[in-house]
Every structure is written in structure tokens, then in C-alpha cells.
């Protein structure tokens, strides 16, 4: 996404889901309520790899203390949108 483009929750969520799909060897159902560890079986290294890809895609840095607020896919999209828009 271009930094100047208009982002919505739905567009951020869509990108996060696509990036999750790239990290999973087999197709997995991803919803807003999906938890990274329990539902999607990400370990800590997998989460950090995903975070790096998210940061690269959106050209944003996610502070480590934000990760505790990003337990589900929906929470991640919400926090990302706030970081990108500078509303947090």
C-alpha cells in the first residue's frame, strides 16, 4: 500500500490475511478472531517473521510492546491501522 493511499480496516485486514497465507505451508482458515498461537499455530519465530513482512509491506515499525495487543488477526489489523494513520 502506498503511504499516501487511503487505507481502511478491511484493506489492512486483507493484506494481513494474505501475508499469513504466505507463511503457512498448507491452506488454513483465517478470520478476524483467529489467534496467532492457538488457532494458526504460529510459534514466536513465525510471528516475528510475519511481523517483519507486515512492517515491510506497510512501511511501518511495530513497537515490541504492541505485539502483546495483537493476539488475533482482527486486533492486528486494528493496531496496524492506528499505527499507519498515526492515531495512536
Residue spans of the language-model regions?
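Phosphopantetheine-dependent thiolation modules in NRPS/PKS and related acyl-activating systems
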Residues: 2-40, 46-52, 56-88
Amino acid at each position: 500500500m502506498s503511504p499516501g493511499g487511503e487505507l481502511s480496516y478491511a484493506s489492512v485486514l486483507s493484506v494481513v490475511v494474505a501475508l499469513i497465507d504466505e507463511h503457512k505451508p498448507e491452506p488454513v482458515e483465517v478470520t478476524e478472531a483467529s489467534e496467532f498461537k492457538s488457532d494458526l499455530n504460529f510459534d514466536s519465530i513465525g510471528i516475528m517473521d510475519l511481523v517483519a513482512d507486515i512492517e515491510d509491506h506497510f512501511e511501518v515499525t511495530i513497537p515490541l510492546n504492541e505485539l502483546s495487543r495483537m493476539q488475533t488477526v482482527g486486533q492486528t489489523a486494528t493496531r496496524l491501522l492506528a499505527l499507519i494513520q498515526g492515531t495512536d
